[in-house]
Amino acid sequence: MYFTLILENESGEQVNLSTTANQYMTSKIEGLNSPAGTVSTSSYAGMNGSYLNNAFIEKRNVVISFAMRGIGIEKRRHQLYQVVKPSRYIKIWYKTANIDVYAEGYVETCEVSNFEQQISGQISILCPDIYWYSRDIFYAYYSGVTGAFHFPFPESDAPFPLGVYATNDTFSIVNDGDETGFTLRIEALPSDIPQEVVAVTPTIYNENGEYLQIKGDILTGDVITVTTKTGSKTVTLTRNGVDSNILNRLVSGSTWLTLKEGTNIFRVEAVRGVKKLRVTLMHRNSYLGV
């Protein structure tokens, strides 16, 4: 199977480990499949069977085995060391004919045999975030007003629309990967009145009735960014170019919504001014195994 494998450090420097006749011959990549789960159970007293305490996946371990070919091996070995440094951040880009993904982790070891006739090596990378993520970002939009202005510009005196109010306060997005969090961007539509309160307490509902609600006023020019991804859940308000943490405005009972596999439908509501909001949902497909 043909594949592309590139390692990139936090400075953006890359080393291409894709199989070539005179560079690297990657013989094995471990850690592409789903990581092993940890399952904890306890026995019933005097009864058959047991009950589940918890089950989770701790981390992903990607191990790359390779050989070095051609001339200039020592130079390429030092180039490898420059990019792949133990304990440092690394991004793994992996691409086949059907998938283009990346994972992020930290280098555990980078070992190369220096004194053998056939130069070989192995790189071990630990990924606290267990998922592979698609290179592409996918978007879904909701807007209370949809632009209707177009060219050529009408020349008659008859009225023509500049915008159309939405009659449906829902939007949908397809998730082709595993269940994952997402980033939600809530913006107030432009207004001629500076610092006008355009909306109050927006709420996002999923199909199951679970919701994420942020109390308070949204002023002209405000942008609220919500991230529901495990390990980086945040609620941030950008006002007049200044970011501030507004996690305390998340209403009790709210759920950190996620994208289930397949089609997801969301509904936008607000105490006031829902038609003056623009909502953008962004996510990358995530995969336990590729």
Please annotate each region the language model reported.
Residues F56-E58, V84-P86, A97, F115-I119, ...:
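Solvent-exposed loop and beta-edge segments used for protein-protein assembly and interaction
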Residues F56-I57, N61-K91, N98:
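Compositionally biased, low-complexity regions
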Residues Y142-V290:
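Intrinsically disordered, low-complexity segments enriched in serine, threonine, and glycine
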Residues S27-N61:
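Short, solvent-exposed beta-alpha or beta-beta edge segments that form flexible loop/patches at the rim
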Residues Y133-Y141:
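Short, charged, solvent-exposed linker or helix-capping segments at domain edges/interfaces
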Residues M47-I71, Q117-I130, N264:
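Oligomerization/assembly interface segments of phage tail-like spikes and tubes
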Residues Y89, W93-S134:
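Short beta-strand and beta-hairpin "edge-sheet" elements
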Residues M1-T41:
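Polar/acidic, low-complexity leader/linker segments enriched in S/T/G and N/D
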